[in-house]
């Protein structure tokens, strides 16, 4: 395979990148691993798709034998969600899935990432499966395949069967997840080639059991939270092993994780190295443990007596090899070099830092590049996907009924420009899933925050294309930033 000279690299990455290379700044590890791309263009066969999750769009919470989930209970608890809103109906995709597949086809999308409702398939969390629940996903998958769209299936996106006593506090829950993963693989791997175990470990552990913002809404002590994190990791590992043992040959297994991504304050050698160190250490309880099959010394030292209790082969299971890593990327953190023991210092965002409609969604387009680069340089995965990226906006219909979400287009165009940089530099980025296909139930924010590129009228469930959908369709057609 051809190795590029620095002069050729300068032509490929432009003036800013060339200046860094000529000045002696360290080149990214991936340079020279892929053919040069035209400006703004992505590799041939780059996979473009959209993403959703079961509880956020399906509705039909009591249909066809589905059991209650923790989010059904939580959302119906007064004061837990915006104006008491629930996912009881949501976007009603359980009944309107063909409409959603049609939207994907109109976009030209080649993949759809969605999650299974665990309690729809196993109403009691384990034991006897619900054939009607499984049949829904088989219909959805067949509809996708018949439309030329590849299904990417996430097994767990926060909606835990309520029947699993103790939830993630119990070591039995990872075991139940392994059984569920095995069943899903046996029944679906004849038509699903890509499975993800869990989505965003920190959200169904810390936000749910430490901060109390998400179901079940608890605020537990550090030792308990660390053990819950460990159980989440163990579920992932058991899920990987179960999928491999029960699926057809060629099935690809990964996860979708939202690590804290540290952007170097200055793009120079020492600050890049500091940001990479921060990425590894600050994600020690989650992605780092998955990729390395161990907890870092720094994490164990910080937690001390509160560190998780590890049994037998737990860490080996947690570190089960993956075919790909999915990264959910939204907002940046920042780091710089420091002379202290860690080698890095974290920078705080000022009050004036820009954000989208969700106050937590700070804007930093370069974060998507650094998420990919840090992941590659630390662990060298076989493949990386951006499994979520998108934003909330204050969408509204104009006098002509159009939804011109120019702010979302701005956000996406800037982030995808930095995604293209990662592709141009040869990192193993294989695809991108925009969050989200349609407006949905945004957890504790209810229906107050809209992330979709299709507007959903939550009274009629009618879908309307936004400007961002037109923009994304054009990008897919060009295979280049539009």
Regions found by a protein language model. Name each.
Residues 2, 8-30:
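N-terminal export signals
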Residues 2-3, 361:
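A structural signal for short, well-ordered beta-strand elements
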Residues 3-4, 8, 110, 470:
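Short alpha-helical segments used as structural interaction elements across diverse proteins
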Residues 13, 108, 148:
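Conserved functional loop/turn residues at catalytic and ligand-binding sites
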Residues 35-78, 124-125, 134-482:
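Active-site region of glycoside hydrolase catalytic domains
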Residues 59-137:
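Active-site-adjacent substrate/metal-binding segments within catalytic domains
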